[in-house]
C-alpha cells in the first residue's frame, strides 16, 4: 500500500497545503492505513472507515487545534488521530502503554474533549463556545455526533440550551450512517447544501424574517412554505426549532461537497447544523456488507476477512447470561428483557429472536431504560435490564428514585464489571459495588464462576425487589454450567477451601485467584457471593477462627466489598487485622485484562505476595 501523501502529513497544517485532488488521493491512502492498522491490532473498524473524508474535511477547513472538534463516543476518531501526529502510535492502539482508542485530552492537544460514553459532544462543545465568548476568543466549536448518539436525551438537552445562548459559534455535524443517499439527494442536494450554507442565503433569510415579523400571518405562511420547500430534499426541520441553521443531508464521502459546505458554515456566526450521510465500512466491501461484525474486530487478515472462530472451550459470562435469560423466559412469561443499544454486547441476540414481543432495545437511553423497567414492574412484569456496569452510572438517579425507593422488582445484569481491557478507563466497571451497596433495598451479587453466575441470576430474579448481578468481560474459568434454574439462600456465602491462620474473603471471579494464592500459604477461602446483604454470620465466624482477614474484589477498594466487611467488624466490636485488595483510587488505562490485573497485584501471585508482605509473621 502506497502512502506517499500520508507520509507528508505530520499535522493538519500539512494537510491544508494540499489541493482538492490530492485530498481525494489522501483519503484513499488514509482509509487503507486504517484498515491495515486495525487488522494488526484489533479495534473499531467500520465506524472509522466511514469517517475518513469527514475527518479530512474538518481538519482541512478548520484551524485545529485552535478550533475545537469534539468527537462524540470517539471510537470513530482513528483518522483524526492519524492526521494529528499519532500515526506511529497506531501500531500499539489500545495496548498497554499505547494510544487510546478514544479521544483523550492528555494524549494530544487536538483531542479537545475526552469521550467514550455517548451523546456528550454537544454539551461539551457548547460549554467551550460559551467559555470562548466570555474570554473574547474567536474560534469555532464543532461537535461530531452519530445518529445513534443523537437518539439520547442529553443531545437534545444541549441543543435546547444552545438555542437560548446568544453570541456563540457552534457547529453540530450529524454523522448519519444508518441511511443511504437516495438518487434525488445527489448533485441537486450538493448545490442546495452549498446554497443554504452560504452567507447570502443566511442574510436574506434573516432580513426576510425581520420584515415579516411585522406581518404575522405572512410570517406564518412563509415559515410553512420554507418547511415544504426544504421537505422536498431534506428531513424535517426539527433542528431549526432549536435555533440551528440546518444544512443537508450531503454525502459524507464526497469531498467536493464537504469542503465548500464546511467553508461556508465556518463563515456563518451562531448555531449551524450539518447533516452528513456516511457508510460504515466504506471502501472495504466485507465491512460494508456486515458493519456489525467489523465494528470491533480482533486481529484479522484483510485479504480474507474475519474467519469463523472455533467455539471457545470456556463460555463467556455474557453467553451464560444470554442462555439463562432465554431459559427463565421459557418458564416465566412475565420476564421482559431490556437493553440500551447493547443487544450483541449484552448477549440478547437469541432472546430477541425467540421472544421478540418481550425484547426492548430502548436505544442509547439508560435513564429511560431503568424507569421503563420500573413502570413494567409496577404492573407485575419482571424486567431484566442488561447493561454494562459503566453505563448504569448514567441511570443512577432512576435506579435510586424510581426503582429502589419503591422497592420494585427489577433485576440488573451488569456486564463488563471490573477491568475491561482494551477499552480502558472509560468503559471499566469499577464502581458499581460502591454505588449500589449504599442504596436501600438493593441486592448486590458477585458470582465467582459461570455456574455461580447462573445460580445468582436466578436468585436475584426470584428476589421480590431490586437486585443486581455483576460479572466481568470475557470467558469464565471453565466451570460446568447446569441447565436448571436453582437458587441459593440470599446473602449467604460458602467456604471453598479450609486453611490455617488467614481467611481470604473473595467477591466475584477473583475467588479463583484467591484459591491459587491460598494453596501456597495454606489460607482459608470463602466465596462470599453477595456484597449485600453481606453474610454477617460468616464474616464474624471467620474473624473468630482466624488471626487475619483478606478481602479480594475486582472493584474499587473505596466503598467496596472490603469496606462492607470492615463495617461489619466495627459494628460487632471485633478488632482484627484486615488487608483489602482491589482496584486503587485511580483510573486504569487500557491494556490486556490479565496483564492489568497482574500489574495491580490481583492475580494469584500478586495476592500471595501481598499477604506475605503484610502477614509474613503469621505464615512462619
Curated annotation (Swiss-Prot):
Enzymatic class: transferase
UniProt xrefs under SMART domains: Transket_pyr
Key words of the record: Isoprene biosynthesis, Magnesium, Metal-binding, Thiamine biosynthesis, Thiamine pyrophosphate, Transferase
Catalytic activity: D-glyceraldehyde 3-phosphate + pyruvate + H(+) = 1-deoxy-D-xylulose 5-phosphate + CO2
Cellular component aspect of the GO annotation: cytosol
Residues at which thiamine diphosphate binds: 75, 116-118, 148-149, 177, 284, 366
GO terms, molecular function: 1-deoxy-D-xylulose-5-phosphate synthase activity; magnesium ion binding; thiamine pyrophosphate binding
Keyword Repeat: no
HAMAP family cross-referenced by the UniProt entry: DXP_synth
Quaternary structure, from the entry: Homodimer.
Protein name: 1-deoxy-D-xylulose-5-phosphate synthase
Natural source organism: Bordetella pertussis (strain Tohama I / ATCC BAA-589 / NCTC 13251)
